[in-house]
């Protein structure tokens, strides 16, 4: 029993000694960003906005992340141990705008069925023709176009950026028969850079739409009514 107690005490002293040594050799790094409202994280924990003091314990490393919507995320690991550069006293990060974000707009019309009631003074054939004309001015390839069932689907249009791949397509289907209406959906999805347009499992819905397509829903709505 005495041996067990002594062992526990020695282990506790050892832990305290190691912790003290780590804190004794700690380094402080004042991190700042070009964007004053960017969030700064240290090992996944938010530690400041725009500027923060990062503690790097002896014989350890810290991963710094800086994030702001519309900008590329910054990530860097700073180590305070042998074989690595000495942690700087200050570290300034210049954030770069996100090219995919700049080339797009946020909209509640993305990935949503928008019902468009057709003008009763126009025949269904005329409305279908107008619909196709509008869509083909934005999309080069239509995979399926069936007026009888009121279904149309374009092929994916892919646009790549340094940090992301964006694919966009249009889907049209019958909404109601009396009065006749179509449901129009602009599908917008995002994946990592250099992703094949066919890699469905790597894409997810995006609440933004590339500026190239920002007026397509409005055109369909205004010209078919």
Protein language model features and the residues they cover:
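Bacterial N-terminal signal peptides that target proteins for export
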Residues: 1-10
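Bacterial N-terminal signal peptides
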Residues: 9-19
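Boundary at the C-terminal end of the N-terminal hydrophobic targeting segment
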Residues: 21-26
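A short, amphipathic beta-strand motif
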Residues: 27-33
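Glycine- and small/acidic-residue-enriched microsegments that form turns, hinges, and capping elements
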Residues: 34-37, 68
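Short beta-strand segments within Ig-like beta-sandwich modules, predominantly Fibronectin type-III
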Residues: 44-49
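Ser/Thr-rich, low-complexity intrinsically disordered terminal regions
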Residues: 50-225
